[in-house]
């Protein structure tokens, strides 16, 4: 009998949400996603020590200023880990822009181009890279500009329908709507503590976004992210892509039985509405307390891990 991971691959592109090389080799995903937390964890893996040493040596060659060396080494390490992962996957690596730049369009574009340049200098073309940006208004504007220059983007920390709509209207390549973190919020802030997979608020959110994109003919790829359990993944089978942590990839691989397509759009393509203005975006996003909380929380957490990574690098310089 077929295992659920093999079955899921027939209807959805499976992406690994990790920097763990062993997991890549084992589960052979199409693509991989990283973020500051994943890079921080990966930096603790013994096999990656040489990548850290190389990044530090490179940074010392670029500048004699300690603060600049930290920035350079951190960027280079994220790219070095991405390069190792690219040896193991046929598709794309997602590398994230510093979360502290989430409200600065110009700085986000500059950082994205720097990361792309480092990949290009290592022989990797743009079609194997996705630049991850937080789905703030400023992040979406940065992505809109980058897409026009041939740099594809992955808009992350996406919790509200307004964020999803603005991303599609900006023509971004891919969005990562978070499932598990939405569930976390509702469990923490409401009376209901258990949800059937089909009623899971994160699943409902991604389903709504998927249907809206397909109904209006948007090309933006929907990649569900941040899963807490197998039920969420099974309920989103048919989504364009799903990025899954190794523990859940393992669970899927060890579970027998078919996975049925749950997401599909069979209706006619309808006209696209007029794009959201900045004021409309903020008003609509602000109507969703969960999304407001989780976007801010996600940016803070990624910024904290970015700081920890820089501290680790600083101590080694």
Swiss-Prot record:
Provide the alphabetized UniProt keywords.
Cytoplasm, Pentose shunt, Schiff base, Transferase
Q: Name one GO cellular component term.
A: cytosol
In terms of InterPro entries, this protein maps to: Aldolase_TIM, TAL/FSA, Transaldolase_1, Transaldolase_AS
Keyword Transport: yes or no?
no
For this chain, one GO molecular function annotation is: transaldolase activity
Q: Where in the cell is it found?
A: Cytoplasm
* The UniProt record lists the keyword Transmembrane helix: no
Example GO biological process: carbohydrate metabolic process
Q: What is its EC number?
A: 2.2.1.2
Q: Give the pathway annotation.
A: Carbohydrate degradation; pentose phosphate pathway; D-glyceraldehyde 3-phosphate and beta-D-fructose 6-phosphate from D-ribose 5-phosphate and D-xylulose 5-phosphate (non-oxidative stage): step 2/3
Q: Identify which residues the record assigns to the active site.
A: 132 (schiff-base intermediate with substrate)
- Catalytic activity as recorded in UniProt: D-sedoheptulose 7-phosphate + D-glyceraldehyde 3-phosphate = D-erythrose 4-phosphate + beta-D-fructose 6-phosphate
Superkingdom as given in the UniProt entry: Bacteria
For the protein in the UniProt heading, the enzyme class is transferase
Pfam families hit by this protein: TAL_FSA
Entry function: Transaldolase is important for the balance of metabolites in the pentose-phosphate pathway.
Subunit structure, as described in the record = Homodimer.
Please state which protein family the record places this protein in: Belongs to the transaldolase family. Type 1 subfamily.
According to UniProt, the name of this protein is Transaldolase
**Gene source species:** Yersinia pseudotuberculosis serotype IB (strain PB1/+)
